[in-house]
Amino acid sequence: DYTSFAIGIDLGVNYFHEENDFSASLTLKNLGGQVKTFDEEHEKLPLNMQVGFTKRLAHAPIRISVTLDDLTHWESSYYNPEGKDISFGDLLFNHVVMGVEVAPSDRFYLAAGYNCKRANDLKADGGSKWTGATLGGGLQLKRIKLGVAYANYHTAASSLVLNFSMGL
């Protein structure tokens, strides 16, 4: 009988400056560890620290977001499996997720994002030109909300998600 047991928690803190429409957040994912080991060897949970910033432009209905992901594994072999020399810029962009949202009204928005690490990983495996990109939008009519999102998380397929919600 092979079993293992671990306890983990995600923690986050957010600062929001309403006057400047600026937000800064810090999250720590997978804090914790094994309680019962699989084979007497303790394994660490994959700790992930993220820092994100979002700012709405002062004179346009545009919000820009930048998140730095997996900061606890800055130069991990996961980001450089062949052990080659990587420039600071390339290393930095392996941790960057960018997004932009255009919301001309409270009832309509369009959004786009780009995950540099996902793009690099999947393009190396033959991914499409959309690899790493996400697109979405939403519309709110009186009591009905409609949303659509596109993402490419695999070399063989993309996902298209439609959502519909209605207030009671």
Regions found by a protein language model. Name each.
Residues 1-168:
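Outer-membrane beta-barrel porins/channels
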